[in-house]
Amino acid sequence: MGSLNHWISEIRRPRGETINARKIKSNRYGKYQRIKYYILLLFLAAALLGSLQIGLLDPLSLLARSIGTAVLPTIHTAALGLLSWVKELGLPILATAAQSTYDLLGSLLLPYRQAHFHGILIIGGFFLTVLILNRLITRFWCRAICPLGALLGLFSRWTLFGLEKDEVTCNHCNQCLIACQGADGPDVGVVWRQPECHLCLNCQAVCPQSSLKFKFYPQQTVTTANPAGTQKVDVSRRAVMASLASGVVLVPLLRSGDAFEVNSDPRLIRPPGSLPESQFVERCIRCGQCMRVCPNNALHPTMLQAGAEGIWSPVLIPRIGYCEPTCTLCGQVCPTGAIAELSLVRKVGNETVPPNRIGTAFIDRGRCLPWAMAIPCIVCEEWCPTSPKAVYFSEETVVDRKKDEVKVKRPSVDPQLCTGCGACEYACPVTDRAAIYITSVGESRSKRNQLLLKTRNMSNPRDETS
């Protein structure tokens, strides 16, 4: 992520005295660089209370999520549109070249079937905003926002490697400031801010007098302007306390909304193997790896279906893609255990082990073709992957509008066999809103979210394990 920000910052930078003066000014330390430490402290306080909201701004999660759900689909769509346009120009040479280019890109870069995701305008827009800000201030993300950079800055006080300045040979040409990536004060006569340094070594490389050297156990020149030699993390005690308090308040605030438990969205279908909802949102870091690896494009980032705490966590949307019965990839790639890695036996079940259920199918008889319009249709039963099938028929003879008798097979669902994979909803020929749909009720991860509850602990209605 830092390398990408650096590349965006430096691409096609104009040269000249005016531009250099601007770079010198922007590369001096600014108070805005404190913000990342306050962000880190806020998220750390929230993490101590069991909420990994830091995944929203963690650079690894941010990069993986943005590339997988927004950047690659956009590139694929643009490339396919451009090559299709060239191919349709009617020129045989261009058409052949376009087809060859597409075949080459398809074998090296482009996926066989590009997935597309919900909410990429917000995810992609946020990522694009971060990149654009780097054009205004070099490495703005790293300097002002990145919580990982702030964490590394806190640990930098114990580093053995640092910058040594030679005030005697320095001619104050400011080349070091022009090349500096971290605004850490590499020039002689000012405090070198060790926590802000990215160790790019640019200042040492461009110094014409060799006045700057990075070495182990550097000798720090103590002067009136620089009495301590180096400067530790520059934060306000009052702001630190405010950040910690905000993190402590953030968790109950996020969970106080009705979407978290008492009025959860019935279409909030989590991936197979997911932990109970309260534990799931605590562990999920929104990296998007499960969405990227899903072969049927079934997993998508949520917005507010899971409440504010669950934003950008994965949800299965059967109308777009169903859960492949023998696939356990999402659990294999999950880095935090929010989605458990299931064996094939635990996923599909056998005589002694029940299958992992993520929901239950329901039939909307007002939209189902055999039920509502006496039109024969058996698609949902054909697509049902369970054995025996969870969708079964009752053959009935009905009278249509012309007073003719029509034999139709009307589907029903056996909730004891349905795993909620969504194949029936995905394949339903009622195109706008499927006549058979999945909700999360009956999911294996929750003992409360069931069709028929044997007992319920009314003293603790939020208890999912009772």
What are these regions (language model features)?
Residues M1-S466:
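Non-ligating segments of multi-cofactor redox enzymes
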